[in-house]
A protein has these predicted regions:
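Bacterial Sec-dependent N-terminal signal peptides
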Residues: 1-28, 244
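Short glycine/proline- and aromatic-enriched beta-strand/turn motifs that initiate or cap beta-hairpins
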Residues: 21-80, 88, 233-244
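Short coil/turn motifs at helix boundaries and re-entrant loops, enriched in small/polar
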Residues: 39, 76, 109-110, 184
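Residues that define the transmembrane beta-barrel architecture of outer-membrane proteins
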Residues: 39-41, 68-74, 119-127, 143, ...
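Gram-negative (and chloroplast) outer-membrane scaffold detector with strong preference
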Residues: 47-49, 79-165, 231-244
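Outer-membrane beta-barrel translocator domains and adjoining extracellular loop/strand segments
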Residues: 54-61, 100-109, 157-168, 209-217
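Extracellular loop and loop/strand-boundary signature of outer-membrane beta-barrel proteins
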Residues: 57-64, 111-120, 134, 165-172, ...
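Predominantly the C-terminal beta-signal and adjacent terminal strand-loop region
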Residues: 185-244
Length: 244
């Protein structure tokens, strides 16, 4: 009986080691095809602009919204391929956001809140180190997936004003942020050198600090840490890139 138990245990251990020793082949090798060659430079970027205007608009419990605003962003980038399908580079970003609310009313049962003459203007700058890995789709030289890891540092300023005439209150903010993010995407060449890229923010860790001065008298400070492990549909991005 002891011999039978011993033999059974040895067979289980041997089978486990044999299973681990065997490599399961799914039929593709990431190094079998070169999508972007070593020594290639990539220069690209993104530009975005959006604007809105509300005239007596209603959204859920917010009524009589009269507001205007816009958002402008630009993000140039360069990358050098240190190996086939593998590159290191830098990305820079600038954003400007303006929101002006002439009036808006919030009505929740018997509670009413009125917002009038609200103005906000903010600027933000960022610089990030980029590590990009291309994943060829078979032997295709036109389409591929890529994964971009970003380590970024950003600074920003914001001005907030509320009121009109002599009854005006205002705040000034300075912010600093440090983030680590993963942005997978897809690339498609439209000719030998120009490509269109699509990417989405999926994974991120961010720390931010905001220092606020209210009415040039009162000071406040806020620290925040955020971790995201999900697809962020608000960070969908399109861009153009030139490879040379």
């Amino acid at each position: 009986m002891r011999k039978l138990i011993f033999i059974t245990i040895m067979l289980c251990i041997t089978g486990a080691f044999s299973a681990r020793a065997q490599r399961y082949d799914r039929g593709f090798d990431l190094n079998s095809s070169t999508f972007v060659e070593k020594g290639t430079w990539m220069v690209g970027g993104k530009v975005g602009y959006s604007t809105h205007k509300n005239d007596n608009y209603r959204f859920l419990v917010i009524e009589d919204i009269n507001s205007t605003g816009y958002r402008f962003t630009v993000s140039p980038m360069f990358c050098y391929m240190i190996r086939d399908n593998l590159g290191l580079g830098m990305r820079f970003g600038y954003g400007r956001n303006l929101l002006s609310i002439a009036s808006a009313n919030i009505n929740i049962e018997s509670v009413g809140i009125n917002v009038k003459d609200y103005f906000s203007l903010s600027h933000d700058f960022s610089a990030m180190a980029v590590y990009r890995n291309y994943i060829p789709l078979g032997a295709s030289k036109r389409f591929a997936l890529f994964n971009e890891m970003q380590l970024a540092y950003g600074v920003g300023e914001a001005k907030i004003i509320d009121g009109h005439g002599t009854n005006i209150v205002g705040s000034f903010e300075k912010s600093h942020s440090l983030s680590l993010g993963i942005n997978p995407g897809m690339i498609a060449f439209i000719n030998d050198h120009v490509a269109v890229e699509f990417n989405v923010g999926m994974l991120g860790l961010q720390y931010s600090n905001v220092n606020q001065t209210h009415n040039q008298i009162y000071n406040g400070n806020r620290d925040a840490t955020q971790i995201n492990f999900k697809v962020n549909i608000l960070s969908l991005g399109f861009g153009l890139a030139y490879y040379l």
